Amino acid sequence: SAASDVYKRQLHDCAKCLPADEKIARCKKHGLPISQVEFANPELLHAKLGAYYAREKYGVDDEDIRSAIEFHTTGRPAMSLLEKIVFVADYIEPNRKPLPEIDEIRNEAFSDIDASVAHILKNTLTYLDSGSCGDTDEMSVRTYKYYTSLNSED
């Protein structure tokens, strides 16, 4: 149903409001691996916890939906269309603070979603490399390389 689809789309941030120490504790409790970057930046764990809760608390059996939740902050190489849509939508949503090149990225999202993914990751990695927000997650780097290589083949 349409209501069910809206509900599932909102699950991507269901663990976002948990305090940092609680995110770490819950990941440990549920046997979810925590990388060094995630331990240093626990806000990243909301995606992993959200995917876990989608399955365990909310009964989401669809692997594509759970993967879209898990990778909506970092992306991953070779994402499905749903994963790309959730990744891009999370970045370009209207309530987000103004970001560099956001209008261009929003336009790309509707004409070339792979280019939009690469553009988002370029901006994210530039921001992280500036030292503004801690370490860079390796999955974001791998995803950026994957999507820039797709665009260079054109």
Language-model segments: residues:
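Histidine-centered active-site/metal-ligand motif
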Residues: 12, 46, 72-73
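Divalent-cation-assisted or electrostatically stabilized phosphate/pyrophosphate-binding catalytic cores
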Residues: 27-45, 80, 103-149
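Helix-adjacent hinge/juxtasegments
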Residues: 25-69
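Short alpha-helix carrying the canonical HExxH Zn2+-binding catalytic motif
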Residues: 10-11, 89
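Histidine/acidic-rich helix-loop-helix segments that form or flank divalent-metal centers
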Residues: 51-99, 103-109
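Short, small-residue-biased leader/transition segments that mark boundaries at the very start
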Residues: 2-7
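Conserved alpha-helical segments that form or flank metal/cofactor-binding pockets of metalloenzymes
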Residues: 11-32
